[in-house]
Structure formats: structure tokens, C-alpha cells
Amino acid sequence: MNIKYDVQKIEKQAQKYWKEKKSFEVIEDYSKEKYYCLSMFPYPSGRLHMGHVRNYSIGDVISRFQRMQGKNVMQPIGWDGFGLPAENAALKNKESPAKWTYKNINYMKTQLNQLGFGYDWAREITTCHPKYYRWEQWLFIKLFKKNLIYKKKAIVNWDPVDQTVLANEQVINGRGWRSNALIEKKEISQWFIRITNYAEELLNDLDKLYGWPDPVKIMQKNWIGKSIGLEITFSRRNSDPLIIYTTRPDTLMGVTYLAISFEHPLALESGKNNYQVQSFIEKCKTIQTSEILNEIMDKKGIDSGFKCIHPITNNEVPIWITNFVLMSYGTGAIMSVPAHDKRDFKFAKKYGIFIKQVINKNESIDKGPIINKGKLFNSEEFSGMDFNQAYESIAKTLIEKNLGNKKINYRLRDWGISRQRYWGCPIPIVNCKYCGSVTVKVKDLPVILPEKVKFYDVSSPIKKMPNFYQTICPKCGSKAHRETDTFDTFFESSWYFARHTCNNNNNAMLDKRVNYWLEVDQYIGGVEHSILHLLYARFFNKLLRDEGLIKYDEPFKNLLTQGMVLKNGVKMSKSKGNTVDPTKMIKKYGADTVRLFILFAAPPMQDLEWNNSGLEGAHRFIKKVYRLVSIYINDSKDYIVNHLNINFLNKTQKHIRRKIHQNLVKITDDINRRYTFNTAISTLMESVDIINKFTKTDTQSIALRSESINIILLTLSPITPHICHYLWLKLGNKKAIINEPWPKVDLKALIESEVQIIIQVDGKLRDKMMMMINTDKEILESEVLSNKNIIKFTKNKNIIKIIIIHNKLINIVTK
């Protein structure tokens, strides 16, 4: 065997074998336990980055390990093909988004193969291909007919850079999730899907996700934002009432003003005849009003001049127009209780509004509001009640007066799914002046997005293409216009996990194979997708279930959220100029080294700091394994390597074998249960060092080295598959290591024949001795008392008694 580690030759040989043998292609096999491992598919941006490499290395280790457990493992891959970067590249490079996207897919596919990931390429999907997106158009039509899809004018989040609408979930700290531009508010006709119809189920089913990290579930729970409260009507003389929602009806008697959104119809009415109000509203329109930004922005308002009637006291309450109440949340109006709310308190102090305390009589509001619940006072017939009593009593009173009712509210809003961009799935709607919005006939699907387009600015080219948008109404046959908005790209990524199971079915969205493979046993991706993608995918899963296409309530049984890859303490990004090209690292060190380092440098759930010295260390370890096997092959060439006979092992050999099998137990647990691949690798390194030092060449030693090296290669193979494939065959094995099972622990090897005994004199540690397990008391005492060190500490002393803790400790008590 060549003593030189030729990394490029070895890795190409392994990859050629897997490709020719179709090692990772699978079909449904009901005689085996299935295992579906899926990493979040990449956007084809042009090059893989180290975040991709980390994500997919984790998935590959899990997949290969589960395969070695005898399971029928599917690990597919695909491409999240639609998106704004393709349009930006089209403007910059003067090439179509389609050409740019498919070119990137080809390059990134080569990179994935160079890294040795065990994907079933026969299940590859590309979301920008009509074969894929025709089925989400089909689903859209189904949902439209069930009234789960609707169109309305709405105040939306408008990204001025990307020139498109963003869902609430896509606004991060008041900025666009892609462009980072400050988001504006704009009224526009939008398509929505009724995700709120599933709010309760999405919330309750979080309890079924035992294999999900708690922080992700908490984020989704908070985003859905269920609250239980009262809907209260504040009447207005000779006008429509204001309806508000509150979770603190116990503070109702402390209401001293109502706050409404500057977009509220009442605010607009007030502004018609009041220049100051009109000016205030215009200023509000220019500021950013995302929910998160509202927490830090300066709270401003103006008296509308209108008043409403308190539902219990019948006193008049002023209505203030504000810049912080969201029209998109509830009714766009809230009751304000400055004595018991921080924001209301500051606002009231700022504008000199009356403050009325109604909770906890013995506490003062001089320094600030009283937020906590307590006993009511100054509240007429409700005085003296606690929160629960007041809640029920006030609710009863309001219901009797027909001025209120109990209500469950959600923070979650219906998902705005239309985008004013080109590179997305066409919405299968025809707009007819006679029939309104009409769905395309199913037989006419897919509505194909024209791919040969030219970009002159950020606007969508299909809006200027009559040959695309001019059509006939499917209902009445009149001339009509095709919808030129496209789906939010999260539409595609919300169901791809299911399509992987039957991607070659051209006659149906899904077929019975989906119920063999789902649920996804292990899903892997970044925690930044907790609210967006993961919530939408759960929602789509329920839509597909209700269409009778799948039988499961949830798509992902277990979720692993890996940390980011950092360099110099910050996330790798092109803008920061701190990226590392995986292809260059593969050419220099090999794919196995890159995989090993990225799995060893940190636990998968934590951020990983990239450093070249760590990469060098990983490369040295692989070369050490290569040399270990090379030396063994040379040492054993004159032997017929027999199965190990444990009855003939000497003390040293038994100790080495015990340690190898103890390490096997730990490695198995680290990979299978704990997903701490870094500690599994550390233990593997320990095993390599043990066998490296054990160079004896007698028959039993050769057999022990053979067993140990086999265990090392088998357990290392999911992590560094290329070198293990090569060395396994060099050892003379007939089957490739990819087809071998995980090694079994010999429980007998774990049994200790000796134990370490702690020896104390008068409670102080004086020595340690190795003794046979369950040594007789008389023999143990004799051995200890004849120990030179113990003789020194007991000299000229009377031994009163000897205390023995079985197989652990002996304490000699003297006087």
C-alpha cells in the first residue's frame, strides 16, 4: 500500500464508486424501518458557503449513520430556485434570471458531489421548473375554491429597494429581510391565504413536537400570539362605535383616553377639516411602523376632537390619533389606561391627559404606572375584586348591556402571498371585468413563467409583456388580463419536503409514497427560519392533509438548528469579505478534511469559529489514520488474520480492547442521541492514538489491531467517507464500507477484571492500587498493609480498624 496519502485520487475513486453503484438511491421498502433525513435546501446563489457545508455535513453524518443501523434512508436535495437575487443578477450581468439560476445550480451541484454528500439525486427538485410549480398552482386553485384564498386592499409592508410587498414575518427590526431597507407602508391589492384559520391548531400542535428545540417552539408560540380577553364597544353619539380588544378588563374603569391608528377611518375623517390632524397623519405615513420598531420609536399623538362613551360610567372619553397603534392589529383602536401601562403613562404625561388609578390602592403612581394585577378600587361596584373576579363581573355586565363579549385573539395575520416581482411562480388567476378574479382551468396548468426576458429596471418585465398577460376569461370567454404578481417564494419551500418523496409523478402533486416517507425524521437548518419557513411549512402540511394528500399533522419529527460559521467573530458574508471558498479548501486539503474540521470545531447547535490551524489539525489526523492502516497492513502481511480469541488476551490486550469498546459506546451515543459530533470525533482520535501506540505483531495483537481498526474506520466513515471507503477496501474487505453495518459493542469487553482501590490512612489519600474485582477481604488487607508507602504512614502507630468500601476504597484508622 502506498504510504503517501493521495487525497484527490482517493476521493475521486470513492465518488465514482457511489455514482456508478447508485449507492444512495432508494425506493420504498416496507420490510425496513424508513428514515428520512432532510437539510434545508439551498438557494442557488452561485457558490456554496461554509454555512451550507456545515448544514449538509451534519445531515450526511446522520444519514450515513442511520443507514448503518439497517434503515431505509432517504436523503434528497433540491434547489430553492426562485428569488430576488436572480433578478438583481440579471440587471447587473445582463442575463436572464433563469440562465443565471440554472448555471449556479450546475456549479453548486458539482460542489456538493465534491464534498461526498450521499444524496439521492434521482429525487432532485428545482422549484423554478414548471414540473414543480404547476402543482402549487393546482393547490392554489383548490384552496381558492375553499375560500382559503382571497384578495383585498391592504396596508402592506413595502420594500422600496426590492420594490415588493413583504409579509410581517419578513420584516426584521423594521427592515426588509433581504435588502435591509427601511420598510414603508403602502395600500395595495394583495392575495392572502387564511393561515389564521389554522392558528389554534398551529399553536396546539407545538406540543406534539417533542424533537424540536424549545426556543423555536417558543418563538412560534409568541408569533401566533394567542390571547384571551374582552372585545369592548365604546359608543359614539350619532356615529359608529369604536371596538377595542383588551386582555386587562380589570383596568377598564381607569380608561382616560382611546388611542387609534393614524390610518383609522376616524383619523382620516378628523383630518378632513383639521389641518393640524392632516399634517400629523402625513408625517406618520413617512415613518416606519413595524411592530418591533414601534417598541423604540417616539410615541406621538394628536387629539382627534372626537369623543366616545365609557361603556360602564357613561363618561365621555377623548379619542387620540397616534403613530404607534397598528391598523393591522385588531381594530386599529386600543383603550388606554395610563395608571397601569408604561406606554400609556408616558403618553398621558407628555400630553397632559388625566390619569386615574384603579389597582392596588396602597401603591403610588407618582414614579410610574402599576403594571401588576391586584385589588380594584375607585371602580364603583367592582372595587375590592381581584383580577379573576373583575374579569368575570365586568364581562357579565358588558354582555348584558350588549357592549362586550369574551374573545380569543391572535397576533398572527393572514399571509400575504403575492409579490410584485418577476422571478416567481405565476399566480393562476385571470382578472375579468365581468367575472372578477377567475382561476385558470386545471387542464391549462402550468401557467408558465416566460424565461426569455430582458431587465431594464427593478420592475417586473411580464407586466410589460402583452403576450403573457393578455388572455381569455376561463369563465365567460371575454378578453381578460392574467395576474402578473407572483407567489412569495416561501410558497415553494413550504411543501418541497413532500414532493421529494414522489418527484417523478407528472400526474399528481403527491401520491401514496408520501405516506411511506413522511414525517421527516430529521430536519436540519438555521434557527433564523424559526418563524418564516418552519411556520409556513407546518401550515402547508395541514393544508395538504386537509386535501387528503398526506395523513400526518406535522411535517418534521425532529429539528436540529445548527449555529452559524464565523470568521474573526462575525458571520461569514461577501459584504464583510471574510468568506472561505469550500472548493479551494477541497483542492488543498480534500473534502474529508473540510467535513472533519467543520464537525469537530464546535457542537452543531453552537456557532463555529473558522480557523486554518484547525483545518491543518484535521488534515493531520486523517493522515494519521492513513498511516495507521498502512503500517497495520505491512505488519500483518505475513499473518492469516483470525477472529480475535478473547480467552487468550493478556492483561494489556484486554485493557486496550476494553477501551476501544468503551469508546464505541460513547461514539454511538454521541452520534445517535446527542448529535455531539465533536465529542464523537474526539473519542475517535483517542482510539486512533491507542492503536497507534500498540505495535505488537504476535497473532493475538494483530487480531486485536484488526478489530480495533475496523471499528475506527466504520465509526469514522459517516464523517470522512472517502478515506474510509479507500482504506476499507485496502484491508481486503469484499463489500464497500457504505454497505457495512455499524459495529456492535461486545458487552463482555466492557467488564472490568480489575479495579482501582483508593488507599487512605486516617481519611487521607496515601496510595492507589489495582486489584482484581471482588478480591477477598483478607487478601486485600494483606496486600495493602504490605504496601511500602502504607507501611511508611502506619509506622509506630496502632491500627484500630480497617474500613473497606467494596471495590472502591480502604481506610486504615490508626491511633
UniProtKB/Swiss-Prot annotation:
Gene3D superfamilies: 3.10.20.590, HUPs (3.40.50.620), Isoleucyl-tRNA Synthetase, Domain 1 (1.10.730.10). GO terms for molecular function: aminoacyl-tRNA deacylase activity; ATP binding; leucine-tRNA ligase activity. ATP binds at residue 574. Coiled coil: none annotated. The keyword Signal does not apply. InterPro entries: aa-tRNA-synth_I_CS, aa-tRNA-synth_Ia, Leu-tRNA-ligase, Leu_tRNA-synth_edit, M/V/L/I-tRNA-synth_anticd-bd, Methionyl/Leucyl_tRNA_Synth, Rossmann-like_a/b/a_fold, tRNAsynth_Ia_anticodon-bd. Its EC number is 6.1.1.4. It holds the Pfam family tRNA-synt_1_2. GO terms for biological process: leucyl-tRNA aminoacylation. It is an enzyme of class 6 (ligase). It is found in: Cytoplasm. It catalyses: tRNA(Leu) + L-leucine + ATP = L-leucyl-tRNA(Leu) + AMP + diphosphate. It comes from the Bacteria. A motif ('KMSKS' region) lies at residues 571-575. A motif ('HIGH' region) lies at residues 42-52. Keywords: Aminoacyl-tRNA synthetase, ATP-binding, Cytoplasm, Ligase, Nucleotide-binding, Protein biosynthesis. One of its GO terms (cellular component) is cytosol. Belongs to the class-I aminoacyl-tRNA synthetase family. This is Leucine--tRNA ligase. It comes from Vesicomyosocius okutanii subsp. Calyptogena okutanii (strain HA). The gene is leuS.
